[in-house]
Amino acid sequence: MASPVTVLENPIPKSGQHLLFFLTSKQQLALEQRPIESSLGYSAYVDHGVSQGVIVNPSSIAAAMRSSLITVYGITKPGTDKQYISVISPTYNLIANRQNQPIETTQKALAACSDNDRNNWVYYLNLPQGTAQYAIYELNIQDSTSAPTVYSGPTPSGNSNLAAVYFSPNKDRFIIFSNTDTRHYLYWVNSTLQSGNRIAGTGSVMSASPLAATTITNVQTRSMTIFLYYMDVNTLLNRIVGKVTDNEVHWYANQVVEGAPPMKVDTLLTGVVVEEKWNCLYYIPDGDTEFRAFNDTIRDSFFDEPREG
């Protein structure tokens, strides 16, 4: 039986693509990014199956641009015991390893970043076999399969959330997490060195705090500014800014975000930088039920020198 089919030109400028939607043999929606110049090759859609059941909540979702298309990742649960890393938009498909097996996670954390070309990197937590310490896992997603890379150096707490950003001058990634210290701190690790580094001044972070990170990259100076947001033990929105050069981050003083409403204790947090002038943060304020936007205008005071604490 022939499949239903429809096509649109990708609205992303200069993508040179048609977005071809059709049904798989399992009667699920598929999407192929076909070049407008038909002589060029393309990656055929591979159906790993839809995870029956729900997108896990509480958990995290993450969005990133890949091949001129916004892709959303999530954690799905087909039954009562296992949960899997999946693409949940623009199609719904399990991510598989090189042996065509779905990729499991036992935790709620998920983050993603992009090189704004063909590569996405997705991060999650798992227990390596035979250990009791959670590790950060990385998937480099270019097509429908990926072999997980384990960051064995960092020691994230099991209830940590994650944030991830891409540093284009070095083609490097930086991942933020909370550690297993008795007093929680935020840590960073990059994909080259893969060792955990404590962020001074973040000792007030709430256990299992939501995390959001935005960036501004300066190609001329080969540097990047990270704006990291989190919840403190008083449920206030905090900000700390880091300057990336090579494989290192110089962190400035953390600050409570002036004027930001207190956060609902179980809210998650996301943000985007706008015109390199302000960060737009979305979270649920205390006493509310809806995600609200708060604009944090970028100021010179963000770059006060760091202090221990």
UniProtKB/Swiss-Prot annotation:
Membrane association type: Peripheral membrane protein
GO biological process: proteolysis
SUPFAM superfamilies: Fucose-specific lectin (SSF89372)
Molecular function terms from GO: serine-type peptidase activity
Top EC class of this enzyme: hydrolase
GO cellular component terms, semicolon-separated: extracellular region; membrane
Localization annotation: Secreted, Cell wall; Membrane
Entry keyword set: Cell wall, Glycoprotein, Hydrolase, Membrane, Protease, Secreted, Serine protease, Signal
Highest taxon, organism lineage: Eukaryota
Function: May participate in wall plasticization and/or intussusception or in cell wall turnover.
Name of the protein in question: Wall-associated proteinase
Native source organism of the sequence: Coccidioides posadasii (strain RMSCC 757 / Silveira)
